[in-house]
Amino acid sequence: MLYDAAVYDRTLTAGSYWETTVDLAEINYPALTQDKTCDVAIIGGGITGLSAALHLARDYGIQSCILEAGALTWGASGRNGGFCCVGAAALGRDRLLKKFGQSETRRYYQAQREGTELVKQLAAEESIQIDAQGDGEIEIAYRGDRWHDLVADYEFLTKVADYPCKLWSPKDLTEQVYPNSRAHGALYTGVSFGLNPIKYTLGLAKAANQHGAAIYPHSPVESWKKDGNWHMLQTAGGQLKAKTVIVATNGYTEDRLHPRLGDRLLPLLSSIITTRPLTSAELKAQGWQTETPIHENHNILFYYRLLKDGRLLFGSRGGTMGDRAENERRRCWMAQALGEKFPAWRDVDITHSWNGLVCASATLTPHVGRLAADESVFYGFAYHGSGVSTGTWSGRTLAQLVAGQTQISDLPAVFRQSLKKFPLPALRVWYLRATFALSDLLKLSL
């Protein structure tokens, strides 16, 4: 394990605000308790796995069984900030263009937009209440060079990717978002929105199950063997047998799961706090104007959005340990950062604090594909913090691949890079600790 055992303890709930918006006791999918055979086994019952199961069953009549290690929504699907947005590659625009060229970079951005649209489409088609908010995403620049980057992003997104975008001056920010004397400006991108991720995930599960997919939570894969053309996935309660496997475990992928997948991913802790509901007078005191999700163009990322009941959700990078003491330090640090950023809310109570794992890859790109050594094994993960939309799109794409409706070569090149091992993988988190320590020392977040 790269982090403290508490990060992986599936008997502990996240303690998130989202958990208070649903009745978790009503989620009654059983664990696997006997041997089963199915067409497709899906390891991971988050957004990617559920989207794959739904599309396999509904669109292609293919039976699948999902093995989820914890309770439904225990992982990132129930812990994220509910940003249905683009940005699944950690490579910036210039690096994407240099590596993949304009045509493939455009295809990547088109796929990202399709992902956000697919979430809304599924919510409408399957009657999923997702508590959608906002009509885009706002990126704020705090330095002159970052503002110039946003201007270049605007030129590319509008002229090449065909995104609806606007550049906002500090005056525009004051009138449409909130007064921010330090900001150089912002980029508004009109393809994103906010939602309640736990409601969305449970809605996907209900829809997938109603269309014929079987869902088995509390059923971690203890061993994975191959017998001829059959994959044998052993859990504590029984064995699942399938000729095709989809791995959709993202930041919670265990290195031991499959030798061709181990040491290829880097889970990163991300932390979130929420305030009590803010009154209309408190919102007015801060000059707050929007429900559209916001993130900042900092070395240290801050992201935030106003929720349906008036709470402010405020997120940032997590720690590098994940133990109780560090979590409390992160909560205090984030509460202080929130108060410094929004002085009118400096003394507002923090009601919820939690963290979860974001997934990065060695290539800094998302990955959707199949193993060259065993083409009956498919995978989708490494969304770099944009898993709501990209996980949904990846799940549909994986279903299309399994059903033979598309080929790997048809995917945007950004998604089909070969999986690469991290050098000295046991030191992955130590690299991260050194990077964060240097960043804090040099105060690069300013």
Where are these regions (language model features)?
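Glycine-rich active-site loop/strand segments that organize a redox cofactor
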Residues: 80-110
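Helical element adjacent to the flavin cofactor pocket in flavoenzyme catalytic cores
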Residues: 156-158, 183-243
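Internal hydrophobic alpha-helix adjacent to the cofactor/substrate pocket in enzyme cavities
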Residues: 391-411
